[in-house]
Each structure stands twice: as C-alpha cells, then as structure tokens.
Amino acid sequence: MTQPSSGGIKRECNSCSSEHFPRVNPVVIMLIISNNKVLLGRGKGWPEGAMSALAGFISPGETIEEAVKRETYEEVGIKIKNAQYVFSQPWPWPSQLMIGMVCEADNEDLNINTDEIEEAKWFTKDQVKAVYDNSGDHFLKLPKFTIAHHLLRNWIES
C-alpha cells in the first residue's frame, strides 16, 4: 500500500519506504478562433448546453502544436494555423497537465466527429462576454478554477 506525500507529487510505500512518482499525462486544450468567434464543443456525456474549449491527449512523439492540429481535425474537421501557447494548469483528475493554446481556424465549416464529441458551435465574442457578465445564455459558465475559463476570459478581454 502506498500513501501520497509531498503534496501528491509522489507516493511512498508503507512497508519498504520506496518512492513512486505518478505519471503525468499532457493534454492540449485550445481556443480555436475565426473572425472574432470562438469554437466550443460539448464532450460525450456532458449535460445538454455545457460547452468548453476542445481538448485532447498528446500522443507519444507528438509536439504540442501537432497535437492541437490533430485533435482539432479529429474532433471537428478543421485545419488550424498559428497555434500559440498561453498558459498551463495541473489537473489532478487523472494526473494531467493541461496546456492552454490559442489558434486560428482555416475555415468555419464544421465536420463534427460524434465519436469524439457531442456537438460544436461557433460563438461570437459578445455571446461569450454576455455569459461572463451574467447577462447571456449560460452555455458555458465554466468554474473559475478551470483553464478553459481563463482561456476564454483572456480572449474576451483582448
């Protein structure tokens, strides 16, 4: 049996005191922008109307930028350009490092892969701002501790 120690960054064996360092899985989460609009999606099993930035795991041997391109194309059939790192966030469920990116879409024609996500839609900056100002349709009221919340907040304030 092991117990967490050092704030959860390692586990120590109760019987032999050996240290184990849990794996951290890198994940890209990206705001896809086009003509002052942002693309948001609803994941499998999420409540109706719950929208967030698209995201996906980075595959072994893949760069962050390659993962952004692949995940975006897999989920919504859009090619992207100019992927830029914004900031990151550790996510403990299950041991992920969320890597926040912003990128531009080549076009706005969606080809949604329903094996990956339930739906995706383009939203204007005014629509997103209204949600954050508590005056609009609450399609994405994301908890303030999430990286998606901060990516969107950055975008509407830019």
PLM regions and their residue ranges:
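Nudix hydrolase/Nudix homology domain
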Residues: Q3-P4, P47-M51, W93, T114-S158
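Hydrophobic alpha-helical positions that pack around
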Residues: L54, V68, T72
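Glycine-rich phosphate/ribose-binding loops and adjacent secondary-structure elements
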Residues: V38, S59-E65
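Histidine/lysine/aspartate-rich catalytic loop segments that bind and position anionic ligands
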Residues: P26-K37, R42-L54
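Cys/His-rich short segments
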Residues: M1-L31
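A short coil-to-beta-strand element that immediately follows conserved catalytic motifs
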Residues: K79-V86
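Active-site-adjacent beta-strand/loop module that shapes the phosphate/pyrophosphate-binding cleft
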Residues: Q89-I112
